[in-house]
């Protein structure tokens, strides 16, 4: 593995993250039912700019992501620029890296800052599981294309007569990997069995996540980084995540049946992330530009790493691969971290990654490293809960984690934090953050 250069501009400026914000996260078909991702993105970027009081023309680039894309708005980033009153000349493009999408957006803006092409930009992501591109069957799609080219009514009727009743049924978005046909939950089940992770361990982690997230809200720790939203019919504000089960008990988790391997499985709806709607964004600048504008950064981006592994086995081990690389590039070890935040796609996936981060054998035989990355101290791990509790609007999760970790680092007097996530396609992402 090749060691990267420090994340600084040509002038030696660090990459500052000056602010971050997100919408509350809502379970599918609840508070944001009928609100498309592009509107959620406009909400959060508009409010982020208003709160920051940064001159509108100071933002030179917006990189935004959306995993479940809508055909009518394929470039969500540009639609956000045009829909929030930003300067129409602002460069804007969209990215997608599955569950690590806003990690990618942040990396892209950081690269523009390091290249010197911009001095300030916004990165983020939004997704809606309530507004989905419902498709049609391949047979109907082909006929519709041919009908559009038909010249006579008779030709059109002949084409339609080829269809069977089942060809007319709507086709929901695929939930399986395109290359393998496996669902993420299938891989989570495989990892639970491979690494000996029990149902009780998974339920305990999920319960911990909900308890810590509920406590974070109760103590007011999230109020500054979560906006209040108003959606049609504008009768009631929506200000807090609605997936968190603050009063649940471990016995409640034990009642649920396995969701993927019905007979022998351990992965349930309760120890997995739910389908969620939401958006999140961060403002990045060069350190000198932040000083010019009189801004006090939340913190700095010290390093990042993206990795890719095979999709047939252990597809969700991205954090175990990307974490050591990000630490190496930051010049740090696991012991140097104040906080370690991992995306909880599934409790099984999270526990498997934690196990392998501390495994000498995995480090030597799989990663080709001399020693294990290191055990993750429970006192530093997902201290405010994780995605199982908050929910997971695919493209927004990374920006949530970055903002949340920087705020918590500042509350603790500063230090280093690492945020990491697995993603579909065997991808992994990790970023090292620094705050004072």
Swiss-Prot record:
One of its GO terms (cellular component) is cytosol. CDD domains: thiolase. Heterotetramer of two alpha chains (FadJ) and two beta chains (FadI). Belongs to the thiolase-like superfamily. Thiolase family. Its EC number is 2.3.1.16. This is 3-ketoacyl-CoA thiolase. One of its GO terms (molecular function) is acetyl-CoA C-acyltransferase activity. Catalyzes the final step of fatty acid oxidation in which acetyl-CoA is released and the CoA ester of a fatty acid two carbons shorter is formed. Transmembrane segments: none annotated. PROSITE patterns: THIOLASE_1, THIOLASE_2, THIOLASE_3. PANTHER family: ACETYL-COA ACETYLTRANSFERASE, CYTOSOLIC (PTHR18919:SF107), ACETYL-COA C-ACYLTRANSFERASE (PTHR18919). It catalyses: an acyl-CoA + acetyl-CoA = a 3-oxoacyl-CoA + CoA. The active site is at residues 99, 392, 422. It is found in: Cytoplasm. It holds the Pfam family Thiolase_N. The keyword tRNA processing does not apply. Pathway: Lipid metabolism; fatty acid beta-oxidation. InterPro entries: Ac-CoA_C-AcTrfase_FadI, Thiolase, Thiolase-like, Thiolase_acyl_enz_int_AS, Thiolase_AS, Thiolase_C, Thiolase_CS, Thiolase_N. The keyword rRNA-binding does not apply. One of its GO terms (biological process) is fatty acid beta-oxidation. Keywords: Acyltransferase, Cytoplasm, Fatty acid metabolism, Lipid degradation, Lipid metabolism, Transferase.
């Amino acid at each position: 593995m090749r060691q990267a250069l420090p994340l600084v501009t040509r002038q030696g400026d660090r990459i500052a993250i000056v602010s971050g914000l997100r919408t509350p996260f809502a379970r599918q078909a609840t508070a944001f039912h009928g609100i498309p991702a592009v509107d959620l993105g406009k909400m959060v970027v508009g409010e982020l700019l208003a709160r920051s009081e940064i001159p509108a023309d100071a933002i030179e680039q917006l990189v935004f992501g959306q995993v479940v894309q809508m055909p009518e708005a394929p470039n969500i980033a540009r639609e956000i620029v045009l829909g929030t009153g930003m300067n129409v000349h602002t460069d804007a493009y969209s990215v997608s890296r599955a569950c690590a999408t806003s990690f990618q957006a942040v990396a892209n803006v950081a690269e523009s800052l390091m290249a010197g092409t911009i001095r300030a930009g916004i990165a983020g992501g939004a997704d809606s599981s309530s507004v989905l591109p419902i498709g049609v069957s391949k047979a109907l799609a082909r006929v519709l294309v041919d009908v559009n080219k038909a010249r006579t009514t008779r030709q059109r009727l002949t084409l339609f007569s080829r269809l069977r009743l089942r060809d007319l049924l709507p086709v929901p978005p695929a939930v399986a990997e395109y290359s393998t046909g496996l669902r993420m939950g299938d891989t989570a089940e495989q990892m639970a069995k491979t690494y000996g992770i029990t149902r009780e361990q998974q339920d305990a982690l999920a319960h911990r996540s909900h308890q810590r997230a509920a406590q974070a809200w109760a103590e007011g720790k999230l109020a500054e980084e979560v906006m209040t939203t108003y959606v049609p019919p504008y009768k009631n504000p929506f200000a807090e995540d609605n997936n968190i089960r603050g009063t649940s008990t471990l016995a409640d988790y034990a009642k649920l049946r396995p969701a993927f391997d019905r007979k022998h499985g351990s992965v349930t709806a309760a120890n997995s992330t739910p389908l969620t709607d939401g958006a999140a964004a961060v403002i990045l600048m060069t350190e000198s530009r932040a000083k010019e504008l009189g801004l006090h950064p939340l913190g700095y981006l010290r390093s990042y790493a993206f990795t890719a592994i095979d999709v047939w086995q252990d597809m969700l081990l991205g954090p175990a691969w990307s974490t050591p690389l990000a630490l190496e590039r930051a010049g740090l070890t696991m012991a140097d971290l104040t906080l370690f935040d991992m995306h909880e796609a599934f409790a099984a996936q999270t526990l498997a990654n934690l196990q392998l981060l501390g495994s000498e054998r995995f480090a030597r035989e799989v990663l080709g490293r001399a020693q294990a990355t290191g055990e993750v101290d429970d006192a530093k791990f997902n201290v405010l809960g994780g995605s199982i509790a908050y929910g997971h609007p695919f493209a927004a999760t990374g920006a949530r984690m970055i903002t949340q970790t920087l705020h918590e680092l500042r509350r603790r007097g500063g230090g280093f934090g690492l945020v990491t996530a697995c993603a579909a396609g065997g991808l992994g992402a990790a970023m090292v953050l620094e705050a004072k």
